[in-house]
């Protein structure tokens, strides 16, 4: 999370607010990393707490309620946006005023993955090692009470009428790197929801 927050504060506009929502079970190290940014003005940084309770939609809806801007770019703690995406996003939103939500391409990489893992999960892996690219994620949407998340896992956004896909180009991507141990742990957790 510290890497993401450092990156966002280096590349965001002053008028953009970063809202971090922490699960009540977050480790002391994660809390410490997030609290280290609390010297930022309130209109630029907000740290909140919410129990996940195995319900990602409810968790994301709580985050939405705590965002003050016109738009929400929901980024997971283990993701990082391409720098160009952050630079271009205000212009994309302004040029497409009727669009309410955007699908963002995501580059997934898993260190330590084997052919057995790929076959087991039915993944497609590119020559670059990108898994299931473009792995579209609905992550940019208007901050509107009528736009909300459903489903506890593999959540889906509802309430918007007009959407668009960003180009399936690395410049517009979220990066989602992990190792095989973390991937297996996440898959096991999702199976309990």
Task: State what each model feature region is.
Residues 1-2:
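A structural helix-start
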Residues 5-49:
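Acidic donor-binding segment of Leloir-type glycosyltransferases
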Residues 48-56:
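Short, acidic/glycine-rich phosphate-metal binding loop used to engage nucleotide
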């Amino acid at each position: 999370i510290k890497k993401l927050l450092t990156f966002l504060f280096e590349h965001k506009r002053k008028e953009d607010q970063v809202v971090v929502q922490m699960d009540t079970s977050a480790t002391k190290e994660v809390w410490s990393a997030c609290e280290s940014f609390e010297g930022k003005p309130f209109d630029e940084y907000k740290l909140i707490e919410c129990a996940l309770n195995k319900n990602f939609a409810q968790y994301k809806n709580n985050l939405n309620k705590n965002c003050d801007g016109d738009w929400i770019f929901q980024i997971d703690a283990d993701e990082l946006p391409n720098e160009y995406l952050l630079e271009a996003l205000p212009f994309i939103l302004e040029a497409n005023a009727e669009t309410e939500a955007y699908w963002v391409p995501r580059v997934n990489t898993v260190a330590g993955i084997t052919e057995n893992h790929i076959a087991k999960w039915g993944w497609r892996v590119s020559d670059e090692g990108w898994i299931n690219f473009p792995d579209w994620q609905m992550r940019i949407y208007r901050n509107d009470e009528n736009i909300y998340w459903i489903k506890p896992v593999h959540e889906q956004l509802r309430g918007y009428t007009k959407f668009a896909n960003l180009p399936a180009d690395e410049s517009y991507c979220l990066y989602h790197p992990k190792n095989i141990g973390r991937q297996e742990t996440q898959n096991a957790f999702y199976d309990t929801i």
